[in-house]
Amino acid sequence: MECCLSEEAKEQKRINQEIEKQLRRDKRDARRELKLLLLGTGESGKSTFIKQMRIIHGSGYSDEDKRGYIKLVFQNIFMAMQSMIKAMDMLKISYGQGEHSELADLVMSIDYETVTTFEDPYLNAIKTLWDDAGIQECYDRRREYQLTDSAKYYLSDLARIEQADYLPTEQDILRARVPTTGILEYPFDLDGIVFRMVDVGGQRSERRKWIHCFENVTSIIFLVALSEYDQILFESDNENRMEESKALFRTIITYPWFQNSSVILFLNKKDLLEEKIMYSHLVDYFPEYDGPKQDHAAAKQFVLKKYLACNPDPERQCYSHFTTATDTENIKLVFCAVKDTIMQNALKEFNLG
């Protein structure tokens, strides 16, 4: 009988060891997929960052994929010009030549979301308007209304885009703007580990959908548009965009769901800040700024400190990087550093080292 029990005990022990081993294996396999949640207010660059991951770590964009963006580029051009035409009226700016108001009426007669081609008379109207002194003044005052960052990029390159055989470049695709509604996921494999990036809509109306994404988040990547220090919200005419972004970051970093997730700050659109800081002074929007004017390095550090001050836990590290999401080389370098941070934290958290 004792012999029998001993054999049973041995078998039970062996089974327990197998179960333990399998549990360890399952835990390890579960961690072979790392979930990265991209957060930030609308137009901070989250979708552009995911496109970069597809270019750098995925299959990129085939000619067929690129053809799928032609309509979107055309729509972005119409949308940008229509935004400026509306602003001309709001800001009471006159056209350089009076008859150009008729061209403006022509461009406004089209619903930009239905645009599928780019030809005369609309092509000529948009080219003529972009050269108009009044529209240029309106463009210079773009912080006073809503205009996409890519407006100048496309409108300055119409000679290429108007060609019959036009095929969008990767840069055209990176710059193409379509507001994210709902949740987009992009998984990619890196060194045998699946990085699952989740991009959620940034506009206020989209944020209630985030709750479904909160489970098992390895890292939060929070994007800040540095260039928004002097801009107002898309959803509200009197709120500073950066203040809204900062309030959101403060909420995110204190959520109980994310206590074990590493936090990475991407201070994005540094190229736009460097351009803008020369004529739009930080102190006019943040009176507590006491650094030099027209100094982009001082401005970047000031904004970084503002965000880091939102973290109530001195023990919790926030990793930060200054980025230009439309610059593939910059994102390649930054994500290389970020990958190491994410991996180290995941190993530490789940004792897989």
Swiss-Prot record:
The gene is Galphaq. Residues 172-180 are annotated as: G2 motif. The keyword Metal-binding applies. Guanine nucleotide-binding proteins (G proteins) are involved as modulators or transducers in various transmembrane signaling systems. Could be the transducin analog, an amplifier and one of the transducers of a visual impulse that performs the coupling between opsin and cGMP-phosphodiesterase. Could mediate a subset of olfactory and gustatory responses. This is G protein alpha q subunit. GO terms for biological process: adenylate cyclase-modulating G protein-coupled receptor signaling pathway; axon midline choice point recognition; cellular response to carbon dioxide; flight behavior; mucosal immune response; negative regulation of compound eye retinal cell programmed cell death; negative regulation of phospholipase C-activating phototransduction signaling pathway; neuron cellular homeostasis. Residues 195-204 are annotated as: G3 motif. It is found in: Cell projection, Axon; Cell projection, Rhabdomere. One of its GO terms (cellular component) is plasma membrane. GTP binds at residues 40-47, 174-180, 199-203, 268-271, 325. Mg(2+) binds at S47, T180.
